[in-house]
Amino acid sequence: MDAKITNSNENKANPVNYSTQGFTGDPKFWSKPYFLNKMKNMKRLYGLFVLLCLMLTACNDDFLDVDPVDRYSDAVVWTDESLITSFVNNIYEGQKWGFHTVMLSSLCDESMEVWAWESQPVVMSELSPSYQGILAPNFWIITFHNITWTNLYKNIRACNIFFENAEKYALEGDVVDKLKGEVHYLRAYFYYWLLSQWGGIPLIEKSFTPSDDLLVARNTFEETVDFIVKDLDEAASILPLNGDKARATKGAAMALKARVLLYAASDLFVSQSLWASGYEHPELIGYVGGDRTERWQRAKKAAKAVMDLGIYHLYGENGGWKNREEATQNYADIFLCHNSDEDIMVQYYDYVNHNSSDFQLPRVGLFNSPNGFHGWGGNTPTGQLVDSYEMADGSKFSWDNPQQAAYPYQNRDPRFYASIMYNGSYWRQRPDDTVGSDPEGIVQTAYYQQSDGSYTPGLDTRQGPIEDWNGSYTGYYMRKFLDPSVNHQYDKQPYPWRQIRYAEVLLNYAEACIELGEDVEARKYINMIRKRAGMPDIPNSETGDVLKEHYRNERKIELAYEQHRYFDIRRWMIAPEVIKNVQGIDIRYPYGVTEPNYSIIDVQERKWNDKSYLLPIYLDEMQKNDLLIQNPLY
């Protein structure tokens, strides 16, 4: 018989919590004076207790039948539409939020985290089963907690509990059916993060109880991919085409499927012998057979299916900007609005009900704006990222070009000005206590020589007069995502994190086309993104590996700081080439001279080891489950 779905608070659970306290083990308890005194007090308390019980019984014989107000029985939860929705809402909170203190960009070649909060072991390839650094599930900063092995499986268990109770109570109805689709999406999302970090992992479809066999072996990489795709197909078949973009929709499920299939088809997962030679279980970390061309075709088809929905569009896709400033503002506005046709899946943060310390809140402006504006300057762009932005005419920037080296921040890709703060760029009016030092709000990361030969540091350097414990080592600050109208020292900006946007889908489609040799089709969609950005088309002469290299740089620029590059450099197997010492810029103005000297400097050591293509499984997980097989080279 189908369960009746209600929307009431009736029939709360009536569980009885029995708790007992034994006598203390303190020897003084049993000393005669202490014991007698305690006994006298206990007698008095007993008398008061009996009297109270008699009074309460006289007033209301049903007193003990009053329901607890803070708990619900399973039967109530799973027959109340609002409570079921609340349960699913809690699962949504398990998504990886991108705006926490340390961003995923600082674990690859996009940015550098300035606080030394144990991100260095990641970029030095020093992680081990017993040491996870900032990626540890119990690390004091929660920035990566949601993507740890422990918490991903915790959220998968919540998804499985939902499905078990949906079956147990025969839940039905439009709202519940939609929630089923959402939970299929969410379970696939959590498994996607596991797959991307560890390869094939145990696929769990039930919520374990203490009586269950908790020892589960890893599934193969291929089985894991297929499971995720199956969940996403199921989600897409249930979910509506349109709806709240902070909740899963048909388009979100289809777009995540396209991403998963693109990742799975990539070099890393067919090249085990190149980086994990001798590993006895290559099926856990990639495909061991099959048709790779067919996998690229599946990835292409999945991305094209999202495009064919016809409901997503690039923000400002027509381009035609009058000047660079218009193109720059359009790109900035993608991330400074609540909703657009480019958004496929977004994530808001509930600042009201999660009012924890600044360290734990996703305050992107406070964490990343310059220290001279009382920001923390946390995830500062690397010199390598800055140099990857093309010139406005589509040519590469190079420090070997004298004209470009003399004026490195002129005539660059409009996205550069929307993404990077550099010396001399305007940000916003400085706070009241510092505005006297700089009424114009100009970023100052240079050093100015005085008549005695000494140098005065700019307001936004780590040696400056404002918050010198924060600030950039590279000479740059992140501008992308930051609203200049917000006083980030005190206020929070309200815009969502973009989990999936349409530009990624177009890039995913173009990448699959390149791998299939369909260069004309690939250029068409890459150029759509470049047109929106105010950049010229990729020339038709670019084909094959040259086009692939250009595409990869375009993806790096368009999706900078959006949690893609960390995985891209691994799946393309270019990490050994790009994980190098972080470069910064030292800018010095000689005394009485208006044009500075620029020097490229190394500001952080980084090293690559092939074991870092995948993460190690935590030692405590290995010890709890002897069926688990560790990833290679750990």
Task: For the regions a language model picked out, list residue spans one by one.
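An aromatic- and glycine-enriched ligand-binding surface/loop that stacks and positions planar moieties
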Residues: 11-14, 31, 60-125, 199-201, ...
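Conserved, well-structured interaction surfaces
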Residues: 73, 81-99, 120-198, 211-250, ...
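Bacterial Sec-dependent N-terminal signal peptides
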Residues: 1, 5, 18-80, 228, 258, ...
